[in-house]
Amino acid sequence: MNVVDASVLVEYLAGGEHEAAATHAIGRERWAWAPALVDAEVGNALRRLVRAEKITARKAGAALDDLLLMRLQRVPHRHLVERAWQLRDSVSFYDGLYVALAETVDAPLVTLDKKLASASGLRTEVELIAPA
């Protein structure tokens, strides 16, 4: 099982250019790890897509419904904060929470974020499924 960041979930749920790669990362069982903040991040990204007229509000609503039905293991981020802060010079605090979770559960972090995938000081495998 992988840790997936919001970029992968948005691509999977909204049917972006790299949907097939995102689907493969999540797997047939639609099971993955993510920090609990993932719902807010995905919701905000879908909002941006609607405002940019890249997807319809109806499609975004359906994507949010699908997100809530996924077998996503949402992990409270309270115990991830310290490690995320230690990574502040390499990645954003949000990304640090995903990295800290991947390190904690000893699973690869899957992302579409090239900058995150090339960050230094991470103690986990980061798999870039497509450059963003």
Model regions: which residues?
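Short, well-structured N-terminal submotif of metal-dependent ribonuclease cores
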Residues: 1-38, 49-58, 114, 132
